[in-house]
Amino acid sequence: LLDKVLCVELGHMRDLQTRSIFANILLKMVYENRLTRQGRTEHIMLVEEARNIAPARREEDPPSVGERMISELRKFGEAMIFVAQFPTQVSSEIIKNSGVRIIHRLAWAEDLKLIGQSLNLTQEQLAHISNLGVGEVVVSLARLQRPILLQVRAESVLSVENRDLSLRGES
């Protein structure tokens, strides 16, 4: 299952609790697989709607099952990408422990506050995030002292051919 490109679409499941349970079962399968295959990163997992795996919680509440497995998977070389429209709906631990953060336009004050705190942004920088245009993103990398602004061209399309990822479009 993990030796090739795989997409698991959970959108047809109407009940959010069912989606969450199924997603956690898949996460557990990946976890069990990684325990037996320790070493370099061989697999990348992309989780859309990350709130279903690692929902936001109060600090005094224990981490979710998904959050604990994610923490363990990172130790075993599993690379993970989490996608969320609203950062406040995702565990703050996931956001804090991310090596790369890609931020599109955020308008809600609570989302801006969370991102501002996690990236140590000024009010001016937060105002800029709330006014980002189409294709504009702020990228934060662990090894950079401050986030950078990037423009993504719409004509660049990611394609999967023969298990190699390549960008198509103008260079």
Residue ranges and their predicted role:
Residues 12-15, 51-52, 86-89, 106-111, ...:
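Conserved nucleotide-binding/hydrolysis micro-motifs of P-loop NTPases
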Residues 135-171:
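Conserved P-loop NTPase motor module
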Residues 35-39, 71-76, 93-96:
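Conserved catalytic network of the ASCE P-loop NTPase/AAA+ motor domain
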